[in-house]
Regions:
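Pocket-lining segment of extracytoplasmic ligand-binding domains
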Residues: 7-100
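Generic secondary-structure boundary/loop-capping signal
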Residues: 52, 57, 64, 114, ...
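Short secondary-structure capping/turn micro-motifs that flank functional sites
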Residues: 28-29, 117, 157-158
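Secondary-structure end/capping motifs
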Residues: 67-143
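Short beta-strand-to-loop elements that line the ligand-binding cleft
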Residues: 1-5
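Short, solvent-exposed coil/turn linker segments
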Residues: 39-42, 126, 151
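Conserved C-terminal helix/tail region of periplasmic/extracytoplasmic solute-binding proteins
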Residues: 135-159
Length: 159
């Protein structure tokens, strides 16, 4: 049964025992709310133990027509996105970054954001590095989970 992060958190907070999988920052919020909950494993660390590429946990999606008609806008967006990742990842910016995360509703408050940011593994991979990383991830998934086959190279933005 699929549940939202909020539903999983509510279930864990109301149960005496249980196991769940939550993304950061939802996991961070749960750990802060209930001292009886513990992190049993770190998926990124587990992945790193068996793979030469990082674990991809998110992506940027755009319509092909937009990318083809506005490549300069896509490149500018990726540059700004990279700047944002650098800002968020700089320990000296942690408090300000946490305030922004809370302000824009990504977390319930800045305290959760400040604790979660170091665990987020924020990165931006582009070009062939991104393609190699995602391809390695697809190789370990059940084919049915990704539509029966690994996507074509045309799926990737390779400027």
């Amino acid at each position: 049964q699929w549940l939202t992060a909020q539903e999983v958190t509510a279930n864990m907070l109301s149960a005496e025992d249980g196991v769940c999988m939550l993304p950061v920052p939802a996991a961070t919020a749960l750990l802060m709310k209930d001292p009886g909950v513990r992190q049993a494993l770190d998926l990124s660390a587990e992945w790193d133990a068996v793979s030469s590429t990082p674990l991809p946990m998110g992506c940027i999606v755009a319509r092909r027509e937009f990318v083809e008609e506005h490549p300069e806008a896509v490149d500018a967006f990726l540059d700004l996105y990279g700047d944002s990742i650098s800002f968020m990842s700089d320990e000296g910016n942690r408090s300000e970054a946490a305030e922004l995360v809370a302000k824009y509703g990504i977390t319930a408050n800045a305290q959760i954001a400040e604790a979660a940011i170091p665990q987020c593994n924020l990165t931006l991979l582009t070009g062939e590095e991104m393609q190699d990383t995602v391809q390695a991830y697809y190789e370990v998934l059940y084919r049915a989970a990704i539509g029966g086959s690994i996507p074509y190279d045309s799926l990737y933005y390779l400027p």
